[in-house]
From Swiss-Prot:
Record keywords, A-Z: Aminoacyl-tRNA synthetase, ATP-binding, Cytoplasm, Ligase, Magnesium, Metal-binding, Nucleotide-binding, Protein biosynthesis
GO cellular component: cytosol; phenylalanine-tRNA ligase complex
GO biological process: phenylalanyl-tRNA aminoacylation
Organism of derivation: Vairimorpha ceranae (strain BRL01)
Subunit-level organization: Tetramer of two alpha and two beta subunits.
Catalytic reaction list: tRNA(Phe) + L-phenylalanine + ATP = L-phenylalanyl-tRNA(Phe) + AMP + diphosphate + H(+)
Name of protein: Probable phenylalanine--tRNA ligase alpha subunit
């Protein structure tokens, strides 16, 4: 007999039964009750009540008797030696307390006749749910029972009890045409049932800020560059930007070098010759680096350390045709072999802006940066003179982080050197200004995050991502 049949059978001769009348666990009973109630065969309510259960020691005493009772039964007519009594340490104290035994000389003798194992009887009452206040207090004190909660279900007959319980869940055209539906029991709609909460994706705060920054660039008249090359050659990442081949940043401590393929052969020959000349002997009023330039060093593949490598590719294409000024931007991933701390990661997203036009000045660059950061909502910014191999003059950009209560670097900027622009074929009066900004730092400022590892990495709280506010910059 199934559990549902057992419940219906018990209800035959009474209006109400309790779950205690059914020998089954609560977690097994509940889904069966829900199923029967949904068909209106039964209805049920429940109530929580306090019960007491036996501990492991209590179960042992219920089975084998209490320690004091067992000691009493072990003492013969000739008594028991004290050393032997000591073996019954757990029962000795209570046996003396109950005056079941007495000490005479070096032996212990019975001092009562026909004693009853009260502790075992109390435990038996507990198993039968007969609770006496004094007994419960004593058993709890001896840690033979513990308190627990029990759910008791009160089950009654429903409107459809005793009727055909096979409720129809689907109405089909055949039932309507034949009129059969008039004689069928349809399962009623339950409008109070809550549907399952569907899991859903959530945009990471970085992606929210990225999209807003992209909108800002587009509002300022910039066009997006193609930056789908995570792997670059040292030629585009360093050499085209007039970075010496013996520069410290090209060392393995700052750069991730590719193992396979370790080198590239796709370098424009004519442009490569111009780059070699500007590095080794100089040109266009520049003295170069006064050092040899090795093509093998330029062919080494790396994970790009900045998206400026994509900027040089784009500027080279602009220089090939009739000159037209351009405002370009990109937001993409870059990689640097740096020590990890609260504000640095080995891979991060770089926001890059590039303007190529005639007659540009450092004032133009500062104006664009101030306007850009104002749109981001970061009004507290300042500039600091800096050095970059490919820009002169150069500036670091700092924003004030209210959480860390200090200024943190949010980007770098500068005017591209003639040694970068002239080998591409640009005229002398063509200037280019560029700025590279971290996407993570403005995001940290926007969302009040002080440790970048709370934003990216294995320790990020998924609830933070789900509940992070939409990003709007005023």
């Amino acid at each position: 007999m199934s559990l549902s049949q057992k419940i219906l059978e018990l209800l035959k001769n009474t209006e109400t039964i309790k779950s205690t009348d059914i020998d089954v666990r609560s977690n097994e009973l509940y889904p069966v009750l829900l199923s029967l109630a949904s068909k209106e065969i039964i209805s049920f309510t429940f109530k929580e009540q306090i019960i007491y259960k036996l501990t492991e020691e209590g179960e042992s005493i219920l089975k084998n008797g209490s320690y004091e009772f067992n000691l009493y039964n072990s003492i013969g007519d000739n008594g028991m030696e004290l050393l032997e009594v000591d073996k019954y340490n757990l029962g000795k104290v209570n046996a003396f307390k109950n005056k079941w035994i007495k000490k005479v000389g070096d032996k212990v003798y019975k001092s009562a006749d026909n004693v009853e194992d009260n502790v075992k009887n109390m435990l038996n009452n507990v198993t039968n749910k007969i609770y006496q206040k004094e007994e419960i207090s004593l058993l709890k004190k001896r840690k033979l029972i513990y308190q627990a909660k029990e759910v008791v279900y009160f089950i009654k007959k429903g409107p459809l009890y005793g009727k055909d319980s096979d409720n129809i869940t689907e109405l089909i055209s055949k039932m309507v045409i034949s009129g059969e539906y008039k004689h069928l029991n349809f399962k009623p709609y339950n409008f109070n049932t809550k549907g399952n909460i569907q899991s859903q994706g959530a945009l990471h705060p970085l992606m929210k800020v990225r999209e807003e920054i992209r909108k800002i660039f587009l509002e300022m008249g910039f066009n997006e560059m193609t930056t789908n090359k995570f792997v670059e050659s040292s030629f585009w990442n360093f050499d085209t930007l007039f970075q010496p081949q013996n520069h410290p940043s090209r060392d393995a401590h700052d750069t991730f070098f590719m193992k396979t393929p370790s080198t590239t052969s796709y370098i424009p020959i004519d442009y490569m010759k111009m780059i070699k000349k500007i590095h080794s002997v100089g040109d266009f009023d520049s003295d170069g680096h006064f050092s040899d330039w090795d093509i093998k060093e330029a062919e080494k593949n790396i994970l790009r350390s900045h998206t400026t490598a994509c900027s040089t590719r784009t500027m080279l294409e602009i220089a090939k045709g009739e000159f037209i000024s351009a405002k370009l931007f990109s937001i993409d991933r870059v990689f640097r072999n740096e020590a990890l701390d609260a504000t640095h990661l080995a891979e991060f997203n770089q926001v890059e802006g590039l303007i190529v036009a005639k007659g540009l000045t450092l004032g133009n660059l500062m104006g664009y940066l101030k306007r850009f950061f104002e749109k981001l909502g970061i009004t507290d910014i300042k500039f600091k003179p800096a050095y970059n191999p490919y820009t002169e003059p150069s500036m670091e950009v700092f924003g004030y982080h209210k959480g860390l209560k200090k200024w943190i670097e949010v980007g770098n900027s500068g005017m591209f050197r003639p040694e970068v622009l002239r080998p591409m074929g640009f005229d002398k009066d063509v200037r280019a200004i560029g700025f590279g900004l971290s996407l993570e730092r403005p995001t940290m400022i926007k969302y009040g995050i002080s440790n970048i590892r709370d934003l990216i990495g294995p320790k990020v709280d998924i609830e933070f991502i789900k509940k992070s506010e939409m990003c709007f910059f005023n």
